[in-house]
Amino acid sequence: MKVLLTKEVKGLGKAGEIHEVKDGYGRNFLVGKGMAEIATNEVINRWKAEQKRRAEKEAQELERLKNVAKELASVTLKIVQKVGANGSLYGAITKEDLSAALMAQKGIEVDKKSFELKTPIKSTGIYEIEVKLGHGIHAELKIDVEGSNV
């Protein structure tokens, strides 16, 4: 019996591979536990179409992330925060603050987990922060932190 693996099966193969197995093993174990489907032409064609659709979606996402990285490289994000008498900020600027400011000022949505803050931003000045967008794509974001008196 030929089966198309839908999940990785130790000792047999990876998802998407077609293998010849004994009838009982294929029907009772692999198909019964949802690890494989009986490899008919319809199932194989459906699997290939699904893989093609996933690859196209992945390529679109990669292109979108590259465009976001280009936008971030050309953006200087301006954040105004309250400062005390000694010139330091009340509290630190967090990843959530950066994500919200980027969305509000530039309309670019970036997950707060993507920002790499090596040290907390607790004073005014210009900072460069690395943004890891996923799929190995990184961008540098300039942040201009200005203070406003209380």
Swiss-Prot record:
InterPro entries in the cross-refs: Ribosomal_bL9, Ribosomal_bL9/RNase_H1_N, Ribosomal_bL9_bac/chp, Ribosomal_bL9_C, Ribosomal_bL9_C_sf, Ribosomal_bL9_N, Ribosomal_bL9_N_sf
Keywords: Ribonucleoprotein, Ribosomal protein, RNA-binding, rRNA-binding
One Pfam family it belongs to: Ribosomal_L9_N
GO CC annotation: ribonucleoprotein complex; ribosome
Highest taxon, organism lineage: Bacteria
Presence of keyword Ribosomal protein: yes
Function statement: Binds to the 23S rRNA.
Name of protein: Large ribosomal subunit protein bL9
